[in-house]
């Protein structure tokens, strides 16, 4: 009996650390604790609020010495103190050695007290009362994989001279040889970053190795908080070589020695998929200014189309260091002629320099785009541009509206242009901005002194914390059923790096873990009506606020947001759903594509990463592999919660986000993002989703693999198989069906000379072991 009393006392000491001591700093006299009969009603009431499983899980995570049987007994003891007198007997039978168990509890009591007091309340806040949408069983979906980032390198190790990059992709034989020599497959292309439909063709553009963009200040470096990563680092999912990379030394270092750190950033690619033929062309331009601008480019973040011209644009790479080199890269393509018109850095739009772009919008037959700009007075802010050009002179843009924030999203609602503003420019608030009524002739050019558009909502009105609003951005504007919807992007992967900058040296300390959990945010989801009345659909009634900037104390408080969510908690109920990245209306329903960061946490927690903090957070939050990958949600009614079409990236857990939607015919095309360059199915994917208007079931998705990529280059066409198999033949026919040429493949490629067909349109048929693909081609 004495042994049990000691056990109860030790347990009570740990339990009360989270219940009473955190409230009034009360202490418990262990000598007065005789057993369950001594538990006051006040304490038992508080204990009822403590979820047993999560409390014991915290103790287990923070002390791996706690064996499974011990944790079962500990769970029984907690339940016993709550008044469940049968729970203890059931658990005690598995732990006959009470003395050994008491030693473990003593150890835990000495070590875990600060974690129970500082970490456990935030842990409970994050995990409790979360429900997620149901799976959609009311429609039939057919989902095909149309294209995917090629394996374009075999990675042998950081700085290894054998790490040779081939943007056209490697053959099956080359991949097999590299694997046999101890290498790993690598997908350098990460995001399908911009996408647009032109008739029956889908155009898209990419970025590469996104977690490494910006060199050592890149987003992925937050997985190594406080460490020097300038020589590169690697975990089980991705690698950044930085200044050790051979590509950087040969390409970026040739421009300036300081640019070697951008070794992981390759030239982005541009593709065109013909939905009628099933063939995709790599239309990336080359030579002269094209090469220069593609090299000095973080990636092509956007694609837009109007009056025969397709635009691709993105921020400069070397400009990410700020200063005079800040700029952008834009490319114009003649969709009718099938050739590029030119490129431009957009550095002089009436004296204003464009530094970033994300979205385009066509309204009343007028093309607009939203940008970040350094205006001619040197101010960093946002602008809406209108296109006045044509194929002969595509670079005619005018500023038709100013905003205090970078224009990240834009669309027309209720006769006005609405903007999703990012706090990356002068106005450090993420917000929704409303422009003036759009006249019949469209928005007109304005001078630099024209008043900025009105801000109607800010994220800071919801989140009162001092830090998290700075990395939570407006995302995905979409009009649906008479209201404007948007989500948020919570760049939570930067939190570990922020913790290091805030002076936390030991990332496993209770203070550091509390900082990481307290700053963690999930995407909230909103809508507004024509009277600017804002509703919170998914979000929080309370959010953690860090007290140190206010009082100097490293503590946390839950503060009311002023909103009550209609459908559930932020993240659509998921802890690591950080981004409502893009939206589209399809068959009258609202589709929402997300980014889920669980696989990022898993990678950072891997053995190669070496930071125990990530593993602790992973174990606390219950990260599971079956949840890896983006979510796609379908909203059929504004008054009902959405349902999941998928919550695991269509079965590809490495695809962590949906970046783009576009409609072509009766299909929804989905462009995904994955920065996991060392994973077998890493890199971007292009999916096609077809949904019957009326359906009764969800069928297992079928996958249609892309057959052929091709690229025109120097009077020739280079064909390569999308899956790496050998090309058997390439046949050329005239439009009457007569054979003009048959060429045999060389491995997974085949090149034909197009000089004999100059000025003609022919039919080309490519045959591989997997099938054949035919298309008309004009030369």
What are these model-predicted stretches?
Residues 4-10:
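Sec-dependent signal peptide recognition
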Residues 24-127:
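N-terminal propeptides/leader regions of secreted preproproteins
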Residues 201-204, 307-313, 317, 365-369, ...:
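Entry beta-strands of beta-propeller and related beta-repeat scaffolds
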Residues 13-21:
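Hydrophobic h-region of N-terminal signal peptides that target proteins for export
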Residues 699-779:
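C-terminal outer-membrane/trafficking sorting elements
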Residues 207-209, 315-317, 372-374, 422-424, ...:
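Short loop/turn segments immediately following the C-termini of beta-strands
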Residues 110, 114-190, 210-298, 305-309, ...:
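Trp- and S/T/G-rich repeat-edge/linker motifs of beta-rich repeat architectures
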């Amino acid at each position: 009996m004495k042994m049990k009393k000691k056990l109860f006392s030790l347990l009570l000491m740990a339990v009360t650390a989270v219940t009473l001591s955190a409230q009034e700093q009360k202490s418990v006299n262990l000598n007065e604790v005789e057993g369950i009969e001594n538990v006051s009603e006040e304490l038992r009431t508080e204990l009822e609020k403590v979820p047993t499983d999560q409390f014991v899980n915290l103790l287990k995570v923070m002390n791996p010495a706690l064996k499974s049987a011990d944790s079962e007994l500990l769970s029984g003891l907690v339940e016993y103190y709550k008044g469940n007198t049968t729970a203890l007997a059931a658990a005690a039978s598995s732990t006959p050695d009470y003395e050994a168990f008491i030693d473990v509890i003593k150890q835990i009591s000495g070590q875990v007290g600060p974690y129970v007091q500082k970490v456990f309340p935030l842990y409970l806040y994050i995990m409790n009362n979360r429900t997620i949408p149901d799976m959609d069983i009311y429609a039939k979906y057919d989902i095909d994989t149309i294209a995917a980032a090629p394996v374009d390198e075999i990675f042998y190790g950081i700085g290894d001279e054998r790490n040779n990059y081939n943007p056209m992709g490697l053959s099956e034989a080359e991949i097999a040889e590299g694997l046999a020599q101890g290498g790993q497959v690598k997908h350098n292309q990460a995001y399908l970053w911009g996408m647009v439909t032109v008739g029956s063709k889908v155009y898209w553009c990419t970025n590469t190795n996104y977690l490494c963009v910006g060199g050592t200040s890149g987003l992925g470096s937050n997985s190594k908080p406080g460490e020097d990563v300038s020589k590169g680092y690697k975990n089980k999912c991705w690698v950044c070589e930085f200044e050790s990379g051979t590509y950087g030394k040969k390409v970026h270092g040739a421009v300036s020695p300081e640019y070697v750190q951008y070794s992981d950033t390759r030239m982005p690619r541009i593709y065109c998929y013909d939905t009628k033929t099933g063939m995709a062309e790599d239309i990336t331009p080359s030579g002269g200014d094209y090469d220069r601008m593609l090299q000095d480019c973080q990636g092509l973040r956007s694609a837009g189309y109007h009056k025969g011209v397709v635009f691709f644009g993105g921020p400069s790479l070397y400009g990410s260091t700020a200063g005079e080199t800040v700029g952008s890269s834009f490319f114009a393509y003649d969709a009718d002629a099938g050739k590029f018109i030119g490129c431009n850095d957009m550095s002089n739009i009436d004296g204003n320099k464009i530094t970033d772009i994300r979205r385009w919008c066509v309204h009343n037959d007028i093309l607009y785009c939203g940008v970040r700009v350094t205006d001619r007075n040197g101010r960093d802010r946002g602008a809406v541009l209108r296109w006045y050009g044509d194929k002969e002179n595509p670079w005619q843009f005018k500023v038709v509206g100013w905003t205090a924030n970078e224009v990240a999203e834009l669309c027309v609602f209720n006769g006005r242009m609405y903007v999703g503003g990012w706090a990356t420019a002068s106005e450090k608030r993420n917000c929704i901005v409303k422009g003036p009524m759009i006249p019949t002739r469209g928005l007109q050019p304005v001078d630099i002194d024209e008043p900025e558009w009105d801000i109607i909502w800010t994220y800071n009105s919801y989140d009162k914390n001092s830090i998290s609003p700075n990395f939570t951005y407006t995302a995905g504007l979409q009009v649906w059923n008479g209201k404007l919807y948007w989500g948020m992007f919570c760049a939570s992967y930067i939190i570990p790096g922020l913790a290091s900058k805030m002076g936390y040296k030991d990332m496993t300390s209770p203070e550091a873990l509390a900082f990481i959990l307290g700053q963690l945010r999930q995407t909230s989801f909103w809508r507004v009506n024509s009277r600017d009345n804002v509703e919170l659909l998914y979000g929080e009634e309370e959010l953690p606020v860090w007290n140190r900037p206010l009082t100097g104390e490293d503590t946390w408080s839950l503060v009311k947001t002023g909103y009550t969510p209609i459908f559930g908690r932020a993240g659509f109920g998921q802890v690591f759903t950080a981004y409502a990245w893009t939206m589209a209306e399809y068959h009258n329903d609202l589709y929402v594509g997300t980014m889920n960061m669980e696989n990022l946490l898993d990678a950072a927690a891997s053995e190669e990463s070496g930071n125990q903090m990530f593993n602790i957070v992973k174990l606390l939050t219950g990260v599971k592999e079956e949840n890896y990958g983006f979510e796609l949600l379908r909203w059929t009614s504004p008054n009902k919660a959405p349902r999941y079409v998928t919550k695991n990236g269509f079965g590809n857990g490495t695809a962590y986000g949906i970046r783009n939607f576009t409609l072509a015919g009766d299909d929804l095309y989905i462009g995904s993002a994955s920065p996991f360059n060392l994973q077998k199915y890493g890199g971007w994917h292009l999916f096609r989703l077809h949904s019957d208007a009326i359906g009764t079931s969800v069928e297992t998705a079928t996958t249609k693999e892309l057959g052929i990529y091709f690229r025109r280059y120097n009077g020739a066409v280079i064909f390569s198989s999308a899956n790496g198999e050998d090309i058997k033949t390439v046949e050329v026919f005239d439009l009457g069906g007569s054979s003009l040429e048959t060429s045999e493949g060389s491995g997974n490629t085949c090149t034909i000379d197009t000089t004999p067909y100059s000025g003609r349109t022919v039919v080309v048929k490519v045959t591989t072991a997997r099938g054949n693909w035919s298309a008309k081609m004009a030369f």
